[in-house]
């Protein structure tokens, strides 16, 4: 169905090259904006309106676009609106938790076209690539989606990840660290690998509480503290893609040992790990707590979510734990706020669901440690995207990667837009 250009494309004219390039830009703009008019597209593409209409008509005939009706007029004739055909192409997104992964298929308008399925795997699973491949094939088959219409696969996972190389350096077995290469060999499509916290942040930035802002900080607060940094609308990844390791900034001299091998990291005093350590100490010390009483026969079954629920029911011990980690995170955020002066900070992840039980101590730390003029203009809000931010962020990122790779400058690499949408 989809073919890369054959050697004959080297004879393609400059005019045809420009036309193909413009069509690709139309697809990218409509994916980003949802729908728009010919005049708005012409302005964005810096081409004449008649030229733009020719491009749109070609894409409608090819089945990529559709006319969705008449828009509002700002004066004069009401414009015709255009949008992508929903079923023209898809991407698969996969979001890793600690001991499982969630996968779903999205259409070109970023809508779920499949339920989220859970895969029993983890980043050190030697069968990881095989399991993701089989799960994706089954998901596509179950929902009648042809592999020819799938542009690519996006995967977010914990670890030190070089997204450009597709390498996760946290995977213990070095021969499996290049997970991007392994998945590309399985899928034979574009594959994008990135850190889970960055994709949570990208989802929030594109679709959630940070959508209207250019300078934003998004914290995914769970077993670690993942950080997404947006400056002037751009996601900051750093030289090798390792930016945002907020969990491992040093906070306590000679503090508790962190999983990274260092002592006193923020993660040791402000994460789900901290919550579970305090609960363990509570059981050992016979602390008075409804939570301790409820789980006295099965202390290993307590989760951070149980602690938050008990705090909402007035359990003072659980409230004190959330207060402790909120104060610690607030101290960490004080450095971020004074260094970057963001427009907004968004808290996502399981611990953020504690809401006022962590927001109040965070603000208390900021009041004590930050310059007032800086901190008073930085709102801290709780995400309302739940567990969907990473999947949505990853799906959008793979779309953007595919569209970026479609901007070929060498005629030999061109893919004919008159045939269906390209995949790798």
Predicted feature locations:
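ATP-binding/phosphotransfer module of carbohydrate and carboxylate kinases, centering on a glycine-rich
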Residues: 1-68, 74-76, 81-117, 123-148, ...
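Residue-level recognition of short loop/turn positions
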Residues: 62, 109, 164-165, 232
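General beta-strand structural signal in soluble alpha/beta enzymes
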Residues: 67-68, 191-195, 229
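Short loop/turn motifs at secondary-structure junctions and domain boundaries
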Residues: 83, 94-97, 210-211, 218-221
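Short glycine-aspartate micro-motif
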Residues: 91-95, 150-154, 216-220, 226-228
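Hydrophobic beta-strand positions
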Residues: 105, 160-161, 229
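Glycine-rich phosphate-binding loop and adjoining helix at the ATP-binding site
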Residues: 112-215, 357-368
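Glycine-rich phosphate-binding loop of actin/hexokinase-like ATP-binding domains
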Residues: 212-270, 419-424
